[in-house]
């Protein structure tokens, strides 16, 4: 059965009403805002009632550099939650919301897979509770208000050539990366160059995911720099006097969404910034709520430990007020062989030599996560093509690093297939975690960037090209240099070149621009050729999707 067929069978016969899932967390129906029988948001009153409740343990799930198909990080996260529940624990999962861009493009669904999924699968992958639409509307409303300000006299003296704020769409559409607007004469606006980001790359997504309450949301929105004046002074949303309007559009989107796994483990799915072009973590509110309602919160960060993992540690944890007690790194035999130079078409053939060559990639990620002082477990997401010799090589190679590596078969077996991972995680949680920051936020911007390049990526140096040096001068001039940095980089490589696989050393990262995101509270460092509006592949996943006359969806994954 396909993922969607498994999910639909569960939804028809076994899925609990969300009120029953909530009751297991100690929540009443009055604490919920229901979206049908299977989805709910937590009310602000429920969130406020939890504010003084102590935290449980926190487990971060990250991964090695993936193949284009992904390595099952969300699947392992869900399966680990189900396995911990089978071990008598009270886990709560916290995941990101899928973006329609990858759903319709490369990946198909993004709610786990097989018998380790969150449900209702179709709803979550498509429109869910409307958060993405609210964000897109808020982004584009702000853009419209900026252009209206230009049209109505421009009292703030905004330079149309130096507007940073872009419009957004939650779909991959390369044709919208660079557009010209305001054509059609004097009544159609001020002509200028503009562009679209995918919604999950917009600063408002990061703001939503880092905001702790409505007051913090408004403060962060007000700080967003939308552009510069003719004399190069920053202009913020607060200067436009539209902070309240934008926050109003995001009021309900700020509330975490509660759903369940196939095995009824509670899961908060909320916020979805990409990890290659944003900070890649679900909302602080969702993770914090999971920590307060369960004894173990399991969350994931996007792509590999070099992207989402690093950003979770350096950007999210200071806001969350909690550091991980253990880290799970998801690895697959196929991805390590891919990093060892095997072509995609040959990944199902046994090749221990290539696996050994690609193991350097996993080793780099293990060392980078260990540098934070947190116990590490490796979860090998086993595929049917993996051989016993390949699996044993990985287990032995990790053992030489004093790291426990175990296999998981949660796609096929659900929580039962994740019991070995659960046991390894529980053992790791018994070890002390001595969290250490990677860098001092007060250090200069170049030092922070170089620290990440050397300690996380294994690189040697950083080259500043194009607009990067003038951007640095602007950052220092305005006193923004104390913010953490958010690296925008390809997910397929430790370098900024997607074709450079494995664990290279001595390379240079090329920085082409640095964009201040004062609302989010970080500086986005644009490297290589990474894009904030992806394109669709030659054969989009959308080509296999359909809906029957009675409304049943097929081909979502």
From Swiss-Prot:
Its EC number is 6.3.4.3. Pfam families: FTHFS. ATP binds at residues 67-74. PROSITE patterns: FTHFS_1, FTHFS_2. This is Formate--tetrahydrofolate ligase. One of its GO terms (molecular function) is formate-tetrahydrofolate ligase activity. It catalyses: (6S)-5,6,7,8-tetrahydrofolate + formate + ATP = (6R)-10-formyltetrahydrofolate + ADP + phosphate. Pathway: One-carbon metabolism; tetrahydrofolate interconversion. The gene is fhs. It is an enzyme of class 6 (ligase). Keywords: ATP-binding, Ligase, Nucleotide-binding, One-carbon metabolism. It comes from Lacticaseibacillus casei (strain BL23). Belongs to the formate--tetrahydrofolate ligase family. One of its GO terms (biological process) is tetrahydrofolate interconversion.
